[in-house]
Amino acid sequence: MKPLDFRRIALSLEGAEEGSHMGAADFRVGGRIFATLASEKQGYGNLMLTPELQAGFVGELPDVFLPIHGGWGRMGMTHIRLAKASEDVLAGALRAAWKLRLEKNKGTKKKRTPKRG
């Protein structure tokens, strides 16, 4: 797979939109990021997963998935090696990140500023 495939599949998910974060393409649903191409020059896509989901993906396909280095990786942020991923694997991983973001969005309320009288 290539970054164009990552982009195509990410944008095929309902409500997904492309944005930019620190100069890199990101993919959002409900205004929140679920995946990025911040590491595309290194051959990776990035997925916003939970540590548990990350462990499952890495355990099943360690040649395709690896935690992002440092604290982000400990929080579940995961690289997917695009050259080693099949379309089905990439689509499944993006769908998992998208679904997780949708679930998190349901529990997120926007802060309201108090009315001044």
Predicted regions and their residues:
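Charge-dense, helix-prone N-terminal extensions
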Residues: M1-G117
